[in-house]
Amino acid sequence: MSSFAEARIDLDAISGNIALLAERAAGAQVMGVVKADGYGHGMVPAARAALAGGATWLGTAFIAEALQLRAAGIDAPILAWLVPPGEPLTEAIDAGIDLGIGSMWVINEVIDAARQARRQARIHLKVDTGLNRGGIGPADWSAAAAALARAEAAGLLTVTGVFSHLACADEPDNPATTAQLEAFHQALSVVDKAGLHPQVRHIANSAALLTRPDARFDLVRPGIATYGLSPIPGLDVPGLRPAMTLSATLVGCKRVRPGSGVSYGYRYVTDRETNLALVPLGYGDGVPRAATNRAPVFVAGRRRTIAGTVCMDQFVVDIGDDTVTPGDRAILFGPGDHGEPTAQDWADALDTISYEIVTRIGRRVPRVYTGAVR
């Protein structure tokens, strides 16, 4: 783990983002989604910050993540929505973790685990409304609801929630979202006819929370917006603040002649006499190799572009006639307050999404936390 590079995480920004999203949710509860190590920000600190900002639920992909939150002393409701075979269901039930049921086979697994735990399982039925990924499809909604109703009547589980996930919410005018919401209402009707009465119905991710009031239901699940990044490129959300700033101290700087090849494969060749600054971060830290000759970096008070191939541990920036000294700082991305690039700028440069940019920053880069909530 390096001391010369850091991902500085503003926990007050996370809390403030949740508070802002709660206002936009207009009465719906807010689930802070902290899967994938809190989108690279650190799961436990992000969870605490989200709760401090007004989240009443936490969301993870896997049971192991939820158990880590419990081990950290967090007792808020947690939903783990992706349950592969072999997961520690009994341990999850003992820990009071809500489980997402997205396949028919999982129902029997959870019932068996509840018997072993001698405790009611808390489950959320996931219905597939058109994403065609996880979730029980329309042909099996009635059978799933009936099976859950029988298990609930037997005292083995309680159906805490019903949920789904949207495919195209980041395209506000895409009719697929309306079609999925209509399908979700149909699924809720099936659940109601089976005699189930879930506490929370939820389908809205960050994009739907911000653009589709009809998708909010009882609970919303902001993911990327929790961390201050817009779920829709080009959509400005006043008040959202990016929480992560990725930076490193420069290792050195050298003057080179025109025509000098830079880094592996000489994919960048200088066209003049110039200064090259060396940044000690690379694809071993989550900086994509695809950032070669494409991604922006803030060095010596200006935005530059990575020059040459991104290596495992380092990359080069052409700074022209400007000068730097070892120990000066290069900022890869941050809130943009001082002219530095943002994670969205990186996403635009690499033809990807900001989610990937922040989530892929590796464990070799220490997280340094600021803010009142720790």
Curated annotation (Swiss-Prot):
Pfam families in alphabetical order: Ala_racemase_C (PF00842), Ala_racemase_N (PF01168)
Cofactors that this protein relies on: pyridoxal 5'-phosphate
The EC number(s) this enzyme carries: 5.1.1.1
Pathway(s): Amino-acid biosynthesis; D-alanine biosynthesis; D-alanine from L-alanine: step 1/1
SMART domains: Ala_racemase_C
Gene Ontology molecular-function annotations: alanine racemase activity; pyridoxal phosphate binding
Modified residues (N6-(pyridoxal phosphate)lysine): K35
Catalytic center residues: K35, Y264
Record keyword Isomerase present: yes
Record flagged with keyword Isomerase: yes
GO biological process, one term: peptidoglycan biosynthetic process
Catalytic activity annotation: L-alanine = D-alanine
Listed GO CC annotations: cytosol
Keywords, comma-separated and alphabetical: Isomerase, Pyridoxal phosphate
Residues engaged in binding substrate: R133, M312
Protein family according to the UniProt entry: Belongs to the alanine racemase family.
Function: Catalyzes the interconversion of L-alanine and D-alanine. May also act on other amino acids.
Family annotation (NCBIfam families): alr
Entry protein name: Alanine racemase
Lineage of the species this protein comes from: Bacteria, Bacillati, Actinomycetota, Actinomycetes, Streptosporangiales
